[in-house]
């Protein structure tokens, strides 16, 4: 399988981060909009650099607080989305991460959320863009991947799927076994992070204390096994928010991150949790 990493995991500017990712052997990256906004280079220049380094831009993120809102707010959200799609076209990527709404004015209505996500997906489809909907652990109402999937299924658009993040699922104690009920082709993206067992606010836990696979207390081998058995064939991607990693040498951290995926792939295979060992491309995880 291919490997990827979110640029938020690393210190420095976007160009330096991309060079470090390529040097460490990653196949692709998730570009954070804050990294792009802070870069001197244009989206076209970042796209060209990634091509030269042999990196694919697997996803652009995040887009927030879209669904479960009144019609006027949703119209504004569609305009925001269209501007985001412009940037994505310039970057040359076709997948956007959409986080579940955290706003206090969010309406608790799955039918409304599905209808609005469907309209967003239609707007995206006209631009050749796909949307990966993610249940944040602190989402106002959608904080469980199973509910996110129900909404996506209800919306019923080919370019709308889910993003599964190990932190958001395991930090809340949700059972990952039901991931296997989601069709593999509707799992648009997978984000992996470990974490220590802490009794604290989940938002602060997520933003400051995530770890690379093998460094925390989550059962990531079991989690990954469920995702692979569901039929997921996309990249194994790391999304690790950690204050220490964002202050340490970027090339060292990128290499450390890459090794953690090798460890996880080996552990998952050794535990017999992969349906077909050939699915893990050894050239991509050495």
For every predicted segment, state its role.
Residues 52, 67-162, 171:
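Active-site acidic/histidine proton-transfer and metal-coordination neighborhood
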